[in-house]
């Protein structure tokens, strides 16, 4: 939403500040990382409390590790969606997010989950929370904790690549 406001004034205040464009966007990305972490904490607390009332519950022992892992594995989305928001607007960004979430859920249970960045968070959270997508049975391969480290490394790789590409693109923007 902040991008939408900045876009209306053609990024005038951001691009005219005596700071490097790269540092401005890195600051925005750091803020969004903290916001993502906070949102994951709120969601985790809500799921834990809601689970105590409902029949399905999130194990408390896996809740905090899941928050950290989900935050790390969703980092790649920050520069990606910042780019989409700046370039195409909020509608395309939200539509792309929904499409990637649906495709990621479908790919998470396949053997090629590691090739599709949106499937990684869904896949790596299964062993932590013992929550299985699509009602799969316990003992399923999705509970294999061996995917945690590769998933985190791949997500950090995609975050690095997306950040470098986004920052290079944003540095070329000029005030109009």
Model-predicted segments: where are they?
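Secretory targeting signals
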Residues: 1, 27-90, 141, 145-148
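Membrane-interface elements of multi-pass transporters and channels
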Residues: 6-7, 45, 49-57, 87-91, ...
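Residue-level recognition of transmembrane alpha-helices
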Residues: 28-29, 97-98, 155
